[in-house]
């Protein structure tokens, strides 16, 4: 039985309309192997648009250690994850489990840093700060909080990165989170098969808390998330200047992060922005310029907290703001 540090599970279903993002994810997972011995289990829910084959082949070419499995029918997201979990447990030994949506671009080095926090006491799950792909300077979420009425709130959604704090959320984002494999094994499997999608991550988080485990958000940017792309209508075309800005930002940010900055890539996006502006009458050139400017601040943002000291005790005080922007968290350390 092969041994791995990290098992990454990615579920795919008819992602042709955003397959470029899926490919970038595959490249990011391949980069993860520089920091953690990583196995990718890429599972498809019986797609009919060829996206699975295209993305799986791209993952292999990128150098990922990937096993691609196509299911006989669409089992839904949560059941597909559970199938993948049991499949992996029979074939490999792994210490950590990463659950990643297929509509995000990851920062591999930062994602790998999260693993060390799973060695702190009873911490069983951890996530970093997830940014919005359409508005890359704004947070998608820093985990989620549940209030006394059972309502859930995405922490810091719609706020800039300086909103992000080290704290213990009620549950982690299903889009990008890491767990201790032994903690998941104690639950039997990640999700409840009765929940097809959405709030599966909430249920998982509460189950871990009920077992005496803790969850943690670490304020370091780990991914840019498109959001709900897997559940969009078939044939949906993702376009628009804001979307283009997010794609350019993610591409250039990764290049800068790995000191692989390429002027041909810049030239390609410049040409694409000009052509797209002419064809769609949207200002893609402006979006390109904004993306390039934001890349200049990227390094400072991603290393905002490099060396967080060992956590002895964290007390979270949630200040609830029931607006679409989510909530901010105020932390007291003792």
Give the label of every model feature segment.
Residues 93-105:
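Short beta-strand-to-loop acidic/aromatic patch adjacent to the donor-nucleotide binding site
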Residues 245, 260-334:
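Non-catalytic, C-terminal membrane-associated alpha-helical segments of glycosyltransferases
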Residues 15-32:
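Short, well-formed alpha-helical segments that are part of the catalytic scaffolds
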Residues 147-169:
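Short, flexible, basic/aromatic active-site loop/helix in glycosyltransferases
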Residues 71-89:
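Glycine-rich, basic loop-to-helix element that forms the pyrophosphate-binding segment
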Residues 17, 25, 44-53, 73, ...:
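A conserved acidic beta->alpha catalytic loop
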Residues 105-146:
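Conserved donor NDP-sugar-binding/catalytic core segment of glycosyltransferases
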Residues 170-189, 193-222:
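A short, conserved alpha-helix in the catalytic core of glycosyltransferases
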């Amino acid at each position: 039985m092969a041994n791995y540090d990290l098992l990454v599970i990615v579920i795919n279903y008819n992602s042709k309309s955003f397959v470029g993002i899926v490919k970038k994810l595959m490249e990011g997972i391949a980069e993860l192997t520089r920091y953690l011995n990583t196995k990718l289990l890429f599972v498809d829910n019986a797609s009919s648009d060829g996206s699975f084959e295209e993305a799986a082949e791209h993952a292999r070419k990128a150098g990922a250690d990937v096993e691609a499995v196509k299911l006989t029918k669409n089992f839904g997201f949560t059941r597909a994850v559970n199938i993948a979990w049991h499949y992996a447990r029979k074939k490999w030994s792994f210490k950590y489990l990463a659950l990643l949506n297929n509509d995000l671009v990851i920062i591999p080095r930062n994602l790998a840093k999260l693993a060390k926090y799973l060695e702190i006491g009873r911490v069983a799950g951890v996530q970093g700060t997830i940014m919005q792909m359409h508005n890359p300077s704004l947070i998608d979420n820093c985990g989620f909080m549940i209030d006394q009425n059972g309502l859930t709130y995405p922490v810091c959604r719609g706020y800039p990165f300086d909103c992000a704090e080290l704290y213990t959320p009620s549950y982690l984002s299903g889009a990008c989170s890491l767990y201790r494999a032994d903690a998941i094994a104690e639950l039997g499997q990640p999700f409840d098969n009765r929940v097809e999608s959405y709030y599966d991550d909430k249920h998982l988080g509460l189950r871990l808390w009920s077992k005496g485990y803790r969850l943690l958000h670490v304020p370091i940017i780990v991914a840019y998330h498109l959001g709900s792309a897997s559940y969009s209508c078939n044939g949906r075309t993702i376009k628009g200047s804001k979307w283009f800005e997010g794609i350019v930002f993610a591409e250039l940010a990764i290049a800068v992060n790995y000191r692989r900055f390429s002027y041909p890539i810049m030239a390609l996006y410049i040409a694409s922005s000009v052509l797209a502006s002419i064809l769609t009458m949207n200002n893609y050139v402006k979006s390109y310029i904004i993306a390039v400017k934001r890349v200049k601040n990227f390094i400072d943002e991603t290393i905002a907290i490099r060396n967080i000291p060992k956590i002895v005790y964290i007390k979270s005080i949630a200040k609830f703001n029931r607006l679409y922007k989510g909530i901010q968290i105020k932390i007291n350390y003792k």
